[in-house]
């Protein structure tokens, strides 16, 4: 089944005298469309908890910023706070290249007050290890990440796939965690058809009133767009 609004509540102890005594780190492997992000913002909203969400893609960060704020988990987006120190009450969505910004001012003194969310955890670790954009600041990013993860109140990692490499990062940092594997498949039972001919796909698309065609390269998207040759069709690429 999907994770549910209160799924993450089990990873903290019941309140005593109005305070939660213990938070548990958790890594959740769950299929796309099973409510991982939804569970997180309900968890944050219900307790009015401060959080830092780390992402590898700016587009994911922008999407999170929009969804979180629309659903009552108020936060800032790192690109919107350039030029000023972060305050201790600021929840933040930040692309990992800019994680060093967390050390500005006194913000780092309050890491223990924050829940850290690592969405698309597997992709985040892969990006951290291999991205050429981190070539000149990888050590600084690793240092800041370790500091954040070892000092924060709780770590929540989610992805549809979790590799041993991703878990090894937590092990290297000396972080204990619970691993949860959700076996529910969001698209189970949905029929799909494999087509090996681009021309066949294009001909089928032309018959549809509305469609969404996803490609794994900008070049392929442009080829299909040009072949369809319909001014009402919109092409969206990295440019």
Positions of PLM-derived features:
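Conserved RecA-like helicase motor-core motifs
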Residues: 71-83, 176-182, 212, 230-239
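Conserved strand-helix element at the start of the C-terminal RecA-like helicase core
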Residues: 49-62, 162-166, 203-235
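Walker A/P-loop
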Residues: 22-42
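Interdomain hinge/linker at the junction between the two RecA-like core domains of SF2 helicases
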Residues: 161-207
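Structural recognition of the conserved hydrophobic beta-strand(s) that form the central parallel beta-sheet
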Residues: 53, 92-95, 117, 153-160
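SF2 helicase catalytic motif II
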Residues: 107-157
């Amino acid at each position: 089944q999907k994770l549910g609004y209160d799924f993450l509540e089990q990873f903290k102890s019941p309140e005593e005298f109005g305070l939660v005594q213990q938070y548990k780190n958790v890594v959740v492997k769950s299929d796309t469309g099973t409510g991982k992000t939804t569970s997180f913002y309900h968890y944050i909203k219900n307790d009015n908890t401060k959080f830092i969400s780390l992402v590898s893609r700016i587009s994911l960060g922008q999407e999170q910023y929009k969804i979180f704020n629309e659903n009552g988990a108020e936060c800032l987006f790192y690109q919107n706070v350039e030029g000023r120190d972060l305050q201790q009450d600021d929840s933040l969505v930040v692309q990992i290249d800019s994680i060093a910004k967390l050390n500005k001012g006194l913000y780092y003194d309050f890491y223990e007050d924050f829940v850290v969310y690592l969405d698309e955890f597997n992709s985040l670790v892969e990006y951290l290890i291999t991205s050429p954009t981190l070539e000149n600041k990888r050590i600084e990013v690793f240092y800041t990440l370790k500091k954040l993860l070892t000092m924060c109140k709780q770590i929540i990692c989610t992805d549809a796939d979790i590799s041993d490499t991703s878990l090894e990062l937590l092990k290297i940092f000396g972080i204990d965690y619970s691993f949860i594997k959700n076996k529910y498949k969001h698209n189970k039972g949905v029929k799909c058809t494999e087509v090996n001919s681009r021309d066949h796909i294009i001909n089928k698309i032309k018959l549809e009133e509305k469609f969404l065609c996803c490609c794994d390269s900008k070049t392929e998207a442009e080829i299909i767009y040009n072949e369809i040759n319909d001014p009402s069709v919109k092409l969206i690429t990295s440019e």
